[in-house]
Amino acid sequence: LDLTLAAARLEAFGQLQRLFLACGGVAAAATDFAERWRTLALFVDRRTERVDAAAFFGRNPVRGVKCAVLFDREAEGLTGAELLWLAAADSDPRRDVTVVGEVVVVDARSKRPGVEGHPARFPNVAVASSATVERVDARWAEYGLGETMASPSERYRRLLLSDKAAW
């Protein structure tokens, strides 16, 4: 499958998305970055402990892809900037980068403490409480910051792994 040609021919992201078959623990793939950066975002259910990227690429042969980043399924739908932030925050090159064939695979999924060399404590995503978001929204004009903008906390809430700072 040549992603550059497929992206040019298919109008909707959903059509391109359906070209990939779930396999090796990968539940979904996003090709938003394939043409420009030769990168795939691969989404994995949190219950999946090990991802077999070789099986995924064996069943979904792609040309031109140089990098694949694994994310928790809950990150699906985040913007490119948000995924970049998540990848930088949730990966350690010494532990989370492998090469499968010609593709660099970065594991940016949330880390389970003590599993596969992960630290005993791992930080949770930081979000403001709903009450705090509502309070800031109600007083936004007082702060003189211009037009009201949506809090990113609402978008990131689905990434929480527990109600504590570390899990």
What are these regions (language model features)?
Residues 1-167:
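Charged, compositionally biased interaction regions
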